[in-house]
Amino acid sequence: MNKIYILALLTAITSFGQVTKRVLFLGNSYTGVNNLPSLTQQVTASTGNTLIIDSNTPGGHTFQGHSTNATSIQKIQLGNWDFVVLQEQSQIPSFPIGYVTTNCYPYATSLNSTILQYNPCAETVFYMTWGRE
């Protein structure tokens, strides 16, 4: 799954013809412990391009948590991001649709709005990890 994600991100990065891109990763331990930001940066470097990364990946964090997390908001507000990768807590997307509609979508929308407010040219990338039981 990580290989597909990295390939999609690299395709998006290189399709714009710029050598340097800025990517912010907001997620939790699935992104942080697996060091996805650094791995993506290394793969990008192997193509001769540069990826400037930053992240906030506290364990168990949700979109709701990131939408009010001072560190996440400050990093978004720094602006000039080309991509902001959002990763929801691993179980939430598998919950009943009513729960997801109430506890996931509004915060994904809120984060995306904040991202676009401070980074009008950014693309929000939703990264879904494998489910956890």
Language-model-derived ranges and their functions:
Residues 32-34, 61-66:
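Short, solvent-exposed loop/turn elements at domain surfaces
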Residues 11, 30, 131:
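Short, glycine/serine-rich, charged loops/turns that create anion-binding
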Residues 75-133:
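Alpha-helical cap/lid subdomain in secreted, periplasmic
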Residues 63-76:
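Charged, often glycine-rich, active-site loop that binds/positions anionic groups
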Residues 4-13:
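Sec-dependent N-terminal signal peptides
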Residues 18-55, 74-75:
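Serine-esterase "nucleophile elbow" of acetyl-processing enzymes
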Residues 55-63, 129-132:
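Acidic helix-start/capping segments at beta-turn-to-alpha-helix junctions
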